[in-house]
């Protein structure tokens, strides 16, 4: 049997998932239970769309709870004191010059379980993340992206 997938995460990422899990287990489950009770009060379940919707919501929520529990159970938390100051790694904040857009961007390198590109938290497994990990200030990397090749220069590295 294969080993379960391990999720490299920052301490902040673990705390965020724990908060989401707590919300789903306490608040969301109660909301769904109430929706099911109300829908059952409407009688005939064969044509009860409120009941169907509540049961679907329940199934989705329970699946999400299992997913979060699995990620937390298999989380490998990055020790901030072990994050190198001069090499990009999980837990680093990296300021880069994006030559395609002629702008500076700051990314946080995180594990795939906590990636959020809209918040500039990119996974170490993403194309840009893979290209940056292991590099130093002054290094220039070419990254294969869906639109072609992007070029980034590492301007600064900090611990997360």
From Swiss-Prot:
Keyword Transcription regulation: yes
Family matches, as InterPro entries: GreA/GreB_C_sf, TF_GreA/GreB_CS, Tscrpt_elong_fac_GreA, Tscrpt_elong_fac_GreA/B, Tscrpt_elong_fac_GreA/B_C, Tscrpt_elong_fac_GreA/B_fam, Tscrpt_elong_fac_GreA/B_N, Tscrpt_elong_fac_GreA/B_N_sf
Keywords: Coiled coil, DNA-binding, Transcription, Transcription regulation
Pfam families: GreA_GreB (PF01272), GreA_GreB_N (PF03449)
Coiled-coil parts of chain: 49-75
Molecular-function annotations in GO: DNA binding; RNA polymerase binding
Entry keyword Hydrolase: no
BP GO terms, sorted: DNA-templated transcription elongation; regulation of DNA-templated transcription elongation
PROSITE patterns, per the entry: GREAB_1, GREAB_2
Function, as annotated: Necessary for efficient RNA polymerase transcription elongation past template-encoded arresting sites. The arresting sites in DNA have the property of trapping a certain fraction of elongating RNA polymerases that pass through, resulting in locked ternary complexes. Cleavage of the nascent transcript by cleavage factors such as GreA or GreB allows the resumption of elongation from the new 3'terminus. GreA releases sequences of 2 to 3 nucleotides.
Family: Belongs to the GreA/GreB family.
NCBIfam families: greA, PRK00226.1-4
Alphabetized PANTHER family for the sequence: TRANSCRIPTION ELONGATION FACTOR GREA
UniProt name for this protein: Transcription elongation factor GreA
């Amino acid at each position: 049997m294969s080993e379960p997938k391990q999720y490299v995460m920052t301490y902040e990422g673990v705390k965020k998932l724990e908060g989401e899990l707590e919300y789903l287990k306490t608040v969301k489950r109660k909301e769904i239970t109430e929706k099911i009770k109300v829908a059952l009060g409407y009688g005939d379940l064969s044509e009860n769309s409120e009941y169907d919707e509540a049961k679907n919501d329940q199934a989705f929520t329970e699946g999400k709870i299992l997913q979060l529990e699995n990620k937390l159970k298999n989380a490998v938390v990055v020790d901030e004191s072990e994050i190198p100051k001069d090499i990009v790694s999980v837990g680093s904040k990296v300021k880069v010059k994006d030559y395609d857009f002629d702008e500076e961007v700051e990314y946080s390198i995180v594990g795939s379980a906590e990636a959020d590109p809209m918040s500039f938290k990119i996974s170490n497994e993403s194309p840009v993340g893979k290209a940056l990990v292991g590099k130093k200030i002054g290094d220039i990397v070419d990254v294969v992206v869906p639109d072609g090749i992007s070029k980034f220069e590492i301007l600064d590295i900090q611990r997360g």
